[in-house]
Amino acid sequence: MAKIQMTTPLVEMDGDEMTRILWKMIKDELILPYIDLKTEYYDLGLEYRNETNDQVTVDSAEATKKYGVAVKCATITPNAARMTEYNLKEMWKSPNGTIRAMLDGTVFRAPIVVKGIEPCVKNWEKPITLARHAYGDVYKNTEIKVPGPGKAELVFTAEDGTEIRELIHNFTGSGIIQGIHNTDKSISSFAHACFKYALDTKQDLWFATKDTISKKYDHFFKDVFQEIYEKEYKEKFDAAGIEYFYTLIDDAVARVMKAKGGFIWACKNYDGDVMSDMVSSAFGSLAMMTSVLVSPSGVYEYEAAHGTVQRHYYKYLKGEETSTNSVATIFAWTGALRKRGEMDKLEDLVTFANKLEKATIATIENGKMTKDLALITSLKDVTVLNSENFIKAIRETFDTM
């Protein structure tokens, strides 16, 4: 059988620990037998990041800007323990954070829904994609512990020296104050990424803040979204048969619990941080969550939403068998290959990606799965497979489709 051809390379970012092992298994078993794979390879494993003083991460992001589509393996973000374990020169930053900043991207997370793994919210039938604004607010805050009585003010000093002053509070005793900010550019980029991704996936877009209480800060987010929507996306949304819907964050939470799913929920930074964990947990498993970084210029980077599965890796190093869920990593590959196929008008590549996703889901629904899914499935008499045999079972399903 002739292999499917590619015209433009994918940017391939390799990673760490157990996900790095799965990465090679997935390529060898599910991709290379069928596709004449073209990739520009970057090793984002912690050892090589350390060797290159993290330059490899910057290079991979630049390549993603150049080619437009990347697929990324999970990577270690070092802490004190990792500094010792890997003998690091310094505590390198999160690769995801570096790439996100360089691409000015928004992260969209969505669950992979399969029969037999029911969400905690019984009416959720379709995935809920969560878009989190990843800049500013409480994550770039400045805080002061107030020692005693006094006046707290918010002061903005323009370049020409003029000042705007607002009283925060007249303290009669000790307390706490916090200053947060965001930028027009960052909010606009977030809005464009959300509208583009909604059109791309043909899903309704919800956005929510607390503009009734935060009449300037949150209202600014609301206004930026509305203005960009009216000016650049309303006609496109109408033509696609999808809608943009704004509501208050508390109303959005209430509506989400009663909804059937099948939409994108855009959130400010803190709301997105909290709600993405709620949504992923309620759908059943973080190992069944996809993640795609979308830039306002239309650049895409696909990865699994989970980490490097450190515990399984240490078992693997001892020669012990692991049953590690590779579904989200497989879907990172299919997402990237599909997008590459769409951009390059390669129907065979798009068809392959869709078929591999269906084969992965069908394998689980036929009762063959990894241990983590066997613990939460409602299916009876399931077969628990090890990491490698699960990937081989997917290939068997794929070949019979």
Question: Residue spans of the language-model regions?
Answer:
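N-terminal glycine-rich phosphate/adenylate-binding segment common to multiple enzyme folds
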Residues: 47-163, 176, 270, 274
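Glycine-rich phosphate/nucleotide-binding loop
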Residues: 256-355, 362-363
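N-terminal alpha-helical transmembrane segments of multi-pass membrane transport
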Residues: 2-8, 18, 22-23, 28-52, ...
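Internal helix-turn-beta structural module
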Residues: 318-324, 339-401
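N-terminal small/polar loop signature for handling phosphorylated ligands or for N-terminal nucleophile
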Residues: 46-60, 222-263, 267
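Flexible, glycine/charged-enriched surface loops at secondary-structure junctions
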Residues: 34-41, 201-209, 233-246, 341-353, ...
